[in-house]
């Protein structure tokens, strides 16, 4: 006679004491489109962007006071380009063939509560091509540290038009 028996006893004890902190990054873009006579003809809004690794690193350096370039009125620029490649965290700026970076308008960026607002004007001779990608950088080119990148088609800017781009980011 062959007798077999199998048995498994398992006891597990654990304490699930964990702290989970989260922060939400909520970007909201706005483009005001003016014709050559400065008549407003369209306002377009969209949400979202991807934080770029180089921008995150620059923010962390600023947070702890190490050497970094601030995203302030002297250094911050909004960039627009015609790139259509999906945003990826490892990118280091705009990817399109045509691109332009414009400095902040006077008094920008601004902070109110938990929201920072960046704003720049693209005048009659600036950025006259398809607008498909957007960024905020701490300099006037892709070699600066780009904070973020958004990809969305907002049409072609015509010679003579002025488009004002604004980004509000709320962190909560």
Q: What is the predicted function of each stretch?
A:
Residues 1-131, 138-172:
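Small cysteine-rich, disulfide-bonded extracellular modules of the LU/uPAR three-finger superfamily
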